[in-house]
Structures are given as C-alpha cells and as structure tokens.
Amino acid sequence: MKYLLYFFRRYKLASLLNLLGLSMAIALFYLFQTQTEYNRNYNTSLKDYQRTYRVETSSLTSLPYDWNIVFPIEIVSYWQNLPHIEQISSLCALTEQVETEYKGMSYQLSYLDLGSNAIGFWGIRMQSDANSAQTDLPEYILSEKTARGIFGAENPIGKTLFITEENRKRPVTIQGIYQDFPDNSSIKNGLIRRREHFHLGNWSNWKYEIFVRLDDPKNKISVEKALTESFFQSSKKESFRLLPVQQANFSKLTQTNGSRYRPSDHMMSIISILALLVGLFNFTNFSLAQAPLRMRSMITRKVMGASTASLRREMVLENIFLTAVALAGAALLILIFQKSPECMNLVSGDISFQNHGQLTGITLLTTLGIGILSALFSAWYATSIPSALVLKGSFGQSPRGKKLRWVILTGQFVVAFAMTLYALVMTGQTHYIFNADYGFNKDKVLYAQIPDAAINKKDYLKQEITRLPFVKSSSFAADILGNADRYMYWERGSGNHRISFQALCVDADFLKTMDIKIAKGRDFNPQDSKGAYILNQTMSRKFPWLSLNQPINKNIKDWNTPEGHYPVVGICENYKLTSMRYDSNTIPAAFVIMGPDMADWGDRNKKIFVRIAQGYDKLEAKKQLEQLIKQLDTEETCEFRFLDEDLQITYEEEFLFIAQVRFFAFICIFITLIGVFCLTLFETEYRRKEIAIRKIMGSTVHEVLLLFAGRYLIPLLAAFVLAAPIGYLISTKWLQNFAEHTPIYWWFFPLAFLMVSTVVVLTVVLQSGRVATENPVNSIKTE
C-alpha cells in the first residue's frame, strides 16, 4: 500500500482518471443492464404471464402490417368454450390521455378500457377495503399513485371526477383503488373503466385487443388451429396466432401508449459488456504502466528476501482495493445520475439499487472478478520480467512489452470506432426523420385539439383565425399525419372488388393547409359538403376500378353500409401517412369529407390545423391563437403544438435508444482517451533519455511530438479495419426497424475515423508535450 500512496502522490491526475474511467464503465454496465432487465421483465407483473397470449389474425387487407390485433368484442363468443382456454379478456387498443377535473383543478390521466373480468385475469390488486374481495371490475377505478395526486389524503371512494370525453364533460364516480403496476406493464396507472358491454352486438367497432390464458403453454399451436377453424371456416388463407404477452408491447402492432420500439436485448447486453471490457482494458493498461516504475524496487526487495508470491499478493491486494474504490465511485455516479431529471430521460423505468438487488449483486461480483483477473495478470506479468532487462532499463522497449500494450489499446480503439460509426448512422437517421420529404409541408404548422365549448363554434372560430394577419390557411381534421401507424380503417365490398383503406376525415381546406399536391382531378371545395373522397396514388393504382368523378361504390357490390357513397373528386400524391416504421407508399388511403348521411358518426374533425405565413414568428402566432380560443368563454385549456416538433413524440423510444448509444459512445471514447493518456505516460517515462539525446542532437519539439503521435497511426488503422464491418453490421441491423431510412453513406466511415483519431492524437500531444519541452539536461541527470 505504501507504493500505491507514493504513486497516487506522484501521478494524481493519471490515478484519478484511471479510477474515474473504471467507475464510469461499471456505472454504464449497470445502467444498460437495467434497461435489458426492464425489457426482459415487461408484463411479468401480470398474473400468469407465462400462459397469457394476445390473439392476432393474418391481415389480407391494405393495412401496413401483415397481422391485425383489433377485434370487435363480439368475437369473444366464438372462443369462450374452446379447449385449453382457461380465460379470455379484452383491452382497448388505444390507451387514451384524458383531461379530468376535480375541485377546479385539471389533471391528465391515462384512460384504459378493460374487460369485466380484468381483476382475475390481469391480477389487479385492489386496496384493502370492501372492494378487495370482488371479482368483477367496477366501472371506474383509480391507481394509488393517481389517487394520491388528485385527492391527497382524502378517501377517493365515492368521489366524482369530471372527464372530457367525446366533446363533453361528464361525471364519473370512483368505485375502487388498485395497487400501482410497474412502468413496464401494459396495464397503465391511471383511470381504468369497464366499457365493453356498450359494444356487445356491434361488429363494426374494431377496437379491442383480445387476450387468452391457456391451461398449458404447450397447447399454443393447437389453440391457434382451433381459433382459426372456429372463425375462418371457409378460408384457407386467413389464420390466427398467439403472441406471448411479454412480447406484445414491443410489437409494431401495439397501439397502447407504451413502448412501440424495443432495442435488441442482445445489443443492450453487448453494449453493457463492452463498457465493462473497455474499463478492464484501461485498468489493466494502467496497472502495466505502473510496472516499469516499480521494477527496481521489486528487485531490491527480492534481494532483501521477499518472495515472488508475496510481491504478487501485494499487487493483487492493491488492485482489488482500487476496484473497490471504483465500485464506490460507480455507486456515487449512479446516485447522481438518478437525481438528475435530464439524465433520467436517458433511461426507462427505475434504476435504484433496492429494486435491482440481483443486478447489483451481479455487477459487484463481476467487477470484483474482473478486477482480480486484471490484478493477477498484471502481477504475474510484472514479476516475470527478467531482472537483466530491468537493470538495463530496456524493458519498456522490449518487443513483448510493446506488443502487449498496443494490443490492449487497439482493442479499446475497435470499440470506440464501432460505437462512433453506430452513433453516426443513428444521427443520420434522426436527420432523415426530421428532414425527409413527407409529401406535405410540416413546417410552420400549428395544431390543437378543439375545446368542447368550441365544437359548435367551428365556423366562427375558423373565420376569426383566418382574419389573423399571420395565418395563411386553416382547416379541421380528425388525425395528425405521420405521427401514428394506425388510423380509421374501412373495408368495403366483396370478391375481386373488395377495397380496404385508411380513411382520414378532413374538411375542404385540409389539403391546401398541409400543402398536399393533387395529381389528378381537383382539390376539395365548399360544394363537397355532401361528401367526397380524394384518394392517394397508391389507392388509385391498387383499385383501378375506382374512377374520378364517380361514386366510390359504383363498381362495388356489397358496400356493407348505407352511407359514404360519395364521388371521388381527386387523386393526390403519396404522403407519409404512418411513421417511418412502415412504407407509406404501399398503404391505400383516402381523405373523406363526411356528408349529412354520416351525422350519426359524430363530428370527428376535432383538431384544428393552422399554417403560418412566411416571415411571422411561430411562437408569437402560437400565443395569439391560444388567446383567441380563450375568448370563446371556454374553461378548458387549449395548447397549440408545432407539427414538426411532434415527431419527437412519435419516435420517442427510438430517440431514447439513440441517446443511450451516443452516451455510451462518448463514455467509451473518454475511457479510451484515459488509456491513451496512461500509455503515453508509460512511453514517456521510458524514453526520457532518448528524447533528451534527440533534442541535444537537434530535434525540435515538433519532431518529438510527431514521433510519439506517429506511433498511433498503425494501431488506429488496424482498429478501424476491424471496427468498420462491425459498425456496419450493427447499424444495418438497427436500420431494419425502419421501412424508410437513411443509407449508410460512405463518408460516415472516414468521419468516424477522423473523430476518434483526432481526439487520440490531441491527447498524445498534450501528454507527451511535457517531456518534449523539458530541459534535456535534467532528463539525462535523472536517468
């Protein structure tokens, strides 16, 4: 330990950086493993999750996916008595966010529909009161956390909330409180309602996900066959399948407000292990860097009677102590990370040690194990060097010593290059998402959900908005283009003339407001109030029997409904209807103005879109629009949002993973630089005399710095050659999550090389500059 204290006093910065690097590597390992654990344990809090499955059916329609997950609730009657199905329940496919009011205060809540048997099926645990023994789901229940946020210490049972739904406020009475579910669960914490009985007998309301619990997972295949035979008796093409509930939330089909994107658990685990390996490389390199400095004292102690075993034991104990200090540092970093809201935005779920006891133990044991292995290797290596080399002072230049140091550092370079390239590709995809041609102009567009009080004043509201000097155009619509993967779906007709498409309800000015180009025919006009369609080019090509200026159902038998027989007035160019997870160019879609015959469907155009003219400030426009809404004497708040900025929400999970990879790449490069710093320290200690002689013989400081920096060229090139295909493969794999994505440009590779190489060379120059500028006489004296 005396030597350790001596070394710390002499090389304070290098020692502290070494400990910081290992601490950061351990903390990074722990954080990424919490994310893997978060994904792996998704829905494991649900009752009998190992035997619970979601029902999906093959989609022969024009949906952008091959499988469909939404059904009318009536379909349950086909399956209730099938063999091997113990229970069957439903969940609304759209978890909503609703505004609720209590004592004049407004709150945003998750709002979820569940089947009447949800308590027994999902394992919902009611609070300890009279409701705890019931088996049927009450009509409205609140989670504990939500109840505390609204009611505080009051008893919520029997209290009335006012929720805004379907353009009106209505009271709901809280009938129970359930215990909170973990964040990684399909059952969200908020307001749960039982509503499926409203849709019994209604085969047109396709909004429910159906879940079944089997008596044994081994019967999955036979149940899939039974589901298909019980429903598709005359079809050999369509079928059902069962998806484990653990995987359901990460499916692209899932429409609840949880994650829709799941980074590969293997990738997350690899990243966490790489973090630990980079820390190990750095720690080992630092231990080896100390070896030449303690060689002479070790030989002296051997002469005085110390055994090789005792010297090795001392070095091992020193390294174990340093590992323990690094563990404490990692724990401190994680606690600091946990206290920072900005940092916590980089992770999902809870990262506290008490909720990850097993992972904490694994991290502790793994780190200590790695520390011991590193210590054993360093101790064996340092004590196995022939004494003659040490006495001559030539160990630092021996081929074996140089090769080992460069191999370790090259391994760090490989990881740094691969992750930098990976991060660059992700950055390219982020740029592509924000800057691709969407087929509509998303810039300078504000939108808002219309308050209930304004629904019946839409004409007046539009008139007043149009009068504002900064408004170029405005319109009402039901949906926001490009921010979802599923919209209202219509299927009409039969046989060869069956059509299926995404139906988007709009008003006559929507295409003009969104700057969507008409390819054939005309745009909507005020005379289309009785109903009209504008198809996208994909729908026009897919269903060629649909003709311009003719009713859409002219050549279609069995339209199935008495309404919607409107003419097709135009064909517009394709636009990005869904997110980039799907190829919008393959999805038939139609804008529709709903006529008086569809009045029973209600007014679906509840969002207002406003295009701001060039030269006007968007923030000031937003402020004035919100003030205008307030003048309608509505108690509800109305917040306008920027359409282009809402992409951040659409790709929230992808952007989270991108941020995590960038964070890892930064830490990886930082730890690698610590390794470079230590190796340069090692080199300069053993080449002091050589540098002094070179300077006496006329070498300049520039030439000495070039001598040190030039030695890194071959390891950097070798590492890049190894890292480039690795980075390309993992980047290609990640891009497969998007149907539309950026290419991997050739210049990503030299850019990654330049980024890492530049910071490495700068580190070498800064560290070796101290020796290069030192008086050569002093170096010769000390050597």
Positions of the model-derived regions?
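Short, strongly hydrophobic transmembrane alpha-helices
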Residues: 10-40, 50, 405-429, 440, ...
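Small-residue-rich transmembrane alpha-helices
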Residues: 27, 31, 241, 320-387, ...
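Intracellular coupling helices
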Residues: 3-13, 17, 21, 279-322, ...
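Membrane-helix entry/capping segments
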Residues: 6, 10-11, 46, 228-272, ...
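Internal alpha-helical transmembrane segments of multipass membrane proteins
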Residues: 263-286, 658-678, 722, 726, ...
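C-terminal transmembrane helical bundles of large multi-pass transporters
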Residues: 635-716, 720, 731
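Membrane-proximal extracellular/periplasmic loop immediately following the first transmembrane helix
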Residues: 32-97, 199-200, 205-213, 222-226, ...
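Mid-to-C-terminal secondary-structure elements
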Residues: 115-127, 138-260, 463-649
